[in-house]
Amino acid sequence: MYFCGYMKNSINIKNRKAKFNYEFLDKYTAGIKLAGTEIKAIREGKANIAESFCEFNNHELFVINMHVEEYSHATHFNHNPRSQRKLLLQRRELRKLEKEVTNSGLTIIPLRLFINDRGLAKLQISLAKGKKLYDKRETIKDRESKRRLDRIQKEYK
């Protein structure tokens, strides 16, 4: 199957809040079960994973609250923008993730939505542990001190 050059790796939607709110443990790349209009909207870049999370239902993993805008050129047979979408992983990965989530109280967060070289939509997910408030404050302090140092170094060059 041949795809145009503009489509290759052109879509890269990130969850920027996740890095600040969570500490990542393991990362996985999962396929997504999508309708025709959903993949077309994603290829246009009209998706948002900022407030989404993953949840198990009957030993299957679903991404919840991922917003995929309705496809502009579709007729009345369009998709629901906030519907649950099934994630496709290998069985052993699913078992491992489900065990970690139920026993350790960890959560699964989507990090990045992208189109791979074969033109398929993939979702990079991570097993994550929520940061405490003081950890978030420390992250902010570190970032500000790094910016300050960079500014000072720039002045003396």
From Swiss-Prot:
Source superkingdom: Bacteria
Q: In which compartments does the protein localize?
A: Cytoplasm
Which Pfam families does the protein's record reference?
A: SmpB
Record flagged with keyword RNA-binding = yes
* Keyword set, alphabetical order: Cytoplasm, RNA-binding
Q: Name one GO molecular function term.
A: RNA binding
Write down the InterPro entries for this protein, in alphabetical order.
SmpB, SsrA-bd_prot, SsrA-bd_prot_CS
Sequence similarity: Belongs to the SmpB family.
Task performed by this protein: Required for rescue of stalled ribosomes mediated by trans-translation. Binds to transfer-messenger RNA (tmRNA), required for stable association of tmRNA with ribosomes. tmRNA and SmpB together mimic tRNA shape, replacing the anticodon stem-loop with SmpB. tmRNA is encoded by the ssrA gene; the 2 termini fold to resemble tRNA(Ala) and it encodes a 'tag peptide', a short internal open reading frame. During trans-translation Ala-aminoacylated tmRNA acts like a tRNA, entering the A-site of stalled ribosomes, displacing the stalled mRNA.
Task: List the protein's name.
Answer: SsrA-binding protein
Q: List the taxonomic lineage.
A: Bacteria, Pseudomonadati, Bacteroidota, Flavobacteriia, Flavobacteriales
